[in-house]
């Protein structure tokens, strides 16, 4: 295999020669910093279809495996050109559309005239273009230290409208400033109300209130300068009074915010509103040190700044837009018994899929050592595992409800005068599906019978010793067999057992009981398959929902008979009624 450096030997000279032979004029060549190739090329009218164009072509280190950057200041097009950086869109964004054999001359010959024609055409002229929109909001340069959270589905507003806004600000991970849009008003009428769940996720960050203004312009601002955009929005807005959001205390900036909306493409021939926030910081009050014997210190003020803050769409429909087959999960509820290593990974992915309500049961506490396999994080250690995963669910999907419960299945005691059977039966009848992630055969037998009695779909998942393999079993009320049938089929050999790697248990220091060994990434394979099975079962009656695979039992092998790792191998089986199973006796 040739190295990238050998691949580029003599390439610049070859590119220049091919451009000249194809009828382009190379006006200048430069090597920035001795490494980055930049060519200034004149493309004649017959190559552009519009007149001569001076092109600046930058070849990255990864060229010719990745495409060049081509810009021109001779054109201003509404499409297929970056409005500020002036890049020409000659090919679709994915690198699979770049053909290295084209070289520069071939790229320009094949794409330049087409891109110019498409960029200068009126909307709907039927040119052969990729089916995507060009949202203008994607072209601005935003602050990397802040984000503006909105719900797309609630932004049905008209051009020219304006009003007051209320927001909450919080400092999230890595000190990032998060501004959550709470409400927008036009006079006394509410024009936008944030969804309830969005605040829940940020309550641990203790958000503060923030007031400001909003306006919808008739077109995107044609400048990338935040200060100029602030001025444009202020001139278009009828309001002249502003709240003082923060006192001018030492170290605390006074903030003003304007949310700016404008029409833009959201898809091919689909128009919606683009948004961003302009954040104005009036500067912080700082006190210079007082010189000895010189009276009061001098009060200094840092300069005011303006920032563009990108709008991040965080409504319920925004979170599920990329997964259409899971639409409807927001109305489903699951009970998960066991929030340990395998259960936690499953819970995380069910939350990402959009399950609307979780009842989480576990008896244990999350320890730092658990994090090698557990889906929790260091900020959740010392919590009950059920509480840690309820917190994780809300971090992932603020619209999901998660109820943790410290619960020990098999504990010989009453809870508020109720037996565990009464508690679990009431829980099972209130949910759409029960998951047993305890990896305890006695508990599996118990919960499967309770699910059978309450006609509740039931799924169990577990890894074998050493995580050489794993098992996922689904039993629904209309199934032919039950979990007892599955166990008997395995003992009879009609359903195989997953590979096990028999190694000694380990007892970490301070832990009350030994635990199995094995890597979290192996365990996750089982949890992910269980998520597929569960989502399929929950979406069974939903048109175009995530489909079931048609199996009741799923057996995984991750190791061969010698204990060597192999690519994951799943086998699926139907669990038929076993003649020796007494659970079906009337």
Feature map (PLM): residue ranges:
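Start-of-domain signal
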Residues: 1-35
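Compact alpha/beta protein-protein interaction domains typified by the UBC
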Residues: 25-95, 100-106
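Glycine-rich phosphate/adenylate-binding loop
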Residues: 137-296, 300-301, 420-586
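A short, basic/flexible loop-to-alpha-helix module at the beginning of a structural domain
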Residues: 307-334, 422-425
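A structured beta-alpha segment of the ubiquitous adenosine-cofactor-binding alpha/beta core
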Residues: 390-432, 438-441
């Amino acid at each position: 295999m040739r190295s990238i450096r050998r691949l580029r030997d003599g390439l610049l000279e070859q590119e220049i020669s091919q451009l000249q032979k194809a009828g382009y004029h190379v006006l200048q060549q430069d090597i920035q910093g001795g490494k980055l190739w930049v060519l200034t090329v004149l493309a004649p009218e017959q190559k552009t279809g519009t007149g001569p164009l001076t092109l600046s072509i930058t070849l990255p280190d990864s060229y010719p495996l990745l495409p060049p950057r081509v810009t021109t200041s001779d054109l201003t097009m509404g499409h297929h050109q970056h409005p500020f950086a002036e890049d020409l869109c000659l090919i679709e964004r994915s690198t699979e559309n770049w053909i290295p054999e084209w070289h520069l001359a071939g790229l320009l010959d094949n794409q330049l005239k087409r891109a110019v024609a498409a960029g200068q055409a009126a909307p709907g002229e039927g040119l052969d273009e990729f089916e995507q929109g060009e949202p203008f909001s994607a072209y601005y340069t935003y602050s990397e230290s802040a984000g503006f959270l909105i719900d797309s589905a609630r932004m049905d507003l008209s051009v020219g409208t304006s009003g007051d806004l209320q927001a909450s600000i919080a400092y999230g991970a890595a000190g990032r400033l998060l501004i959550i849009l709470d409400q927008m008003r036009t006079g006394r009428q509410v024009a936008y109300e944030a969804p309830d769940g969005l605040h829940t996720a940020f309550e641990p960050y203790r958000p503060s209130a923030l007031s400001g203004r909003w306006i919808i312009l008739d077109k995107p601002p044609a400048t990338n300068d935040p200060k100029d955009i602030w001025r444009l929005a202020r001139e278009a807005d009828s309001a002249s009074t502003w709240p003082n959001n923060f006192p001018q205390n030492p170290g605390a900036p006074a903030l003003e915010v304007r949310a700016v909306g404008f029409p833009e493409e959201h898809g091919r021939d689909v128009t919606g509103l683009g948004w961003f926030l302009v954040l104005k910081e009036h500067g912080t009050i700082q006190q210079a040190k007082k010189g000895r014997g010189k009276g009061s210190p001098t009060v200094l003020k840092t300069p005011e700044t303006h920032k563009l803050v990108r709008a991040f769409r965080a409504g319920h429909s925004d979170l599920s837009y990329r997964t259409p087959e899971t639409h409807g999960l927001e109305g489903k509820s699951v009970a998960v018994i066991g929030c340990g290593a395998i259960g936690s990974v499953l819970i995380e992915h069910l939350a990402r899929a959009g399950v609307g309500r979780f009842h989480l049961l576990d008896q244990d506490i999350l320890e730092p050592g658990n994090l090698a396999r557990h889906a929790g994080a260091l900020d959740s250690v010392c919590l009950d595992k059920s509480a840690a995963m309820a917190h994780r669910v809300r971090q992932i999907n603020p619209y999901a409800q998660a109820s943790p419960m410290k619960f020990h299945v098999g504990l010989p005691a009453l809870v508020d005068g109720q037996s565990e059977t009464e508690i679990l039966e009431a829980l099972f009848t209130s949910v759409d599906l029960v998951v047993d992630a305890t990896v305890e055969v006695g508990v599996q037998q118990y919960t499967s019978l309770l699910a059978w009695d309450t006609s509740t779909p039931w799924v169990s998942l577990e890894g074998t010793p050493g995580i050489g393999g794993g098992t996922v079993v689904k039993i629904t009320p209309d199934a032919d067999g039950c979990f007892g049938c599955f166990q008997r089929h395995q003992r009879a050999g009609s359903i195989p057992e997953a590979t096990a790697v028999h190694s000694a248990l380990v007892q970490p220091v301070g832990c009350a009981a030994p635990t199995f060994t094995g890597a979290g990434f192996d365990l996750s394979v089982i949890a992910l398959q269980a998520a597929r099975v569960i989502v399929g079962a929950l979406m069974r009656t939903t048109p175009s929902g995530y489909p079931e695979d048609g199996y009741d039992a799923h057996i995984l092998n991750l190791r061969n008979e010698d204990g060597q790792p192999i690519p994951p191998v799943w086998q699926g089986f139907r669990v038929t009624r076993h003649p020796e199973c007494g659970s079906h006796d009337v």
